[in-house]
Amino acid sequence: MALSRLLSTSKSKVLYDDLSEESQKRVDNKNRKSLALSKRPLNQGRVTIDQAATMLGLEPFSFSDVKVNKYDMFIAKQDYSVKAHRRATFNILVDPYWFHQPLTHYPFFRVATFAMVWIGIKGRASGITTLRIIDKSYVNSSDQVEVEVRYPISKNFAVLGSLANFLALEDKHNLQVSVSVDDSSVQNCVISRTLWFWGIERTDLPVSMKTNDTVMFEFEPLEDKAINHLSSFSNFTTNVVQKAVGGAFTSKSFPELDTEKEFGVVKQPKKIPITKKSKSEVSVIM
C-alpha cells in the first residue's frame, strides 16, 4: 500500500521564485545596504568594539589590555604617639613592602577600607582631638577634607570607613592625615597612642565606588581582675572588639565638655552629584 503511494503518478508542485526582476533588484539593494550598515563602527553596537577600533585605526586594541583586576591584599599600618598641644600631618602609607609588591603595575589606588584606633591615656583630660583625612589635590580647603572626626582625647575609640575615589600613584603625596589637639588641661606629655590601618586597593580602571558611611566605636574600660595571671590576657583582643562593636555610632554628645560642639563623624566622604537637565533646558537644546 505504501509502495503504491510512492510510485503513484500524481503531479507534484514545482517550487520557483515568484519575484520579478525589479523586486529582486530591490531585495539585493536592501541586502547590500544592511551589509554596509553592519560594517559601520558607529552603529549602536552592531559591530564589536574591537572591530570598530580596528576600522578607526586604533589597532591593536582589546579590553584584555585593561587590567581591571584589583590588587587589594595590601594592608599598611602606621603607629604614632600624640602629644598635647600638637598639630601634626603625615602621609598615608600606600606602597607595600618589597615582598608584597604585585607582579603587575597598577597606576591608580584608593583606600578601600581604613581603621583608626585612638587610645587615650589621660583619663581626666578635657581636651578635644580632630582627625582629618585630606586630599591636598583640591584648592579649596573645605573640599580637601574627605573624613573628619572630632572626639574627646580622654576616650578610647575607633573609626572605620573607606574612600570612594581613586588617586594616581604619582599623586600619593597628596593623601594625608591631619591630627590636631585642643587641650589646656594637660601639658608636656603624650596623651594617646594612635594606630592606623589602611586597606589599599589598586587598579588601572579607576571607576569610583559607592560611598560608605564612616562609623565609630567607643571602647569600654576592661575589667581589672586577676591581672597578675597571664591567662587573663588570652582573650584580650576578642574582649575589646566585642565591647566596641556593641555600639556603633556616627555622632555623640558630651554636655559636660561642650554642648555647642558636635562629637563623632563630622564629615563623610561624598561626591558632587550629577545634575539632570530639566525638560525646559532639553527642549531649548533640541
Curated annotation (Swiss-Prot):
Q: Is RNA-binding tagged as a keyword?
A: yes
Molecular functions per Gene Ontology: RNA binding
Q: Which Pfam families match?
A: Tenui_NS4
Single biological process term from Gene Ontology? transport of virus in host, cell to cell
The UniProt record lists the keyword Hydrolase: no
Give a short account of what the protein does.
Transports viral genome to neighboring plant cells directly through plasmosdesmata, without any budding. The movement protein allows efficient cell to cell propagation, by bypassing the host cell wall barrier.
> What family, per the record?
Belongs to the tenuiviruses pc4 protein family.
Q: What is this protein called?
A: Movement protein
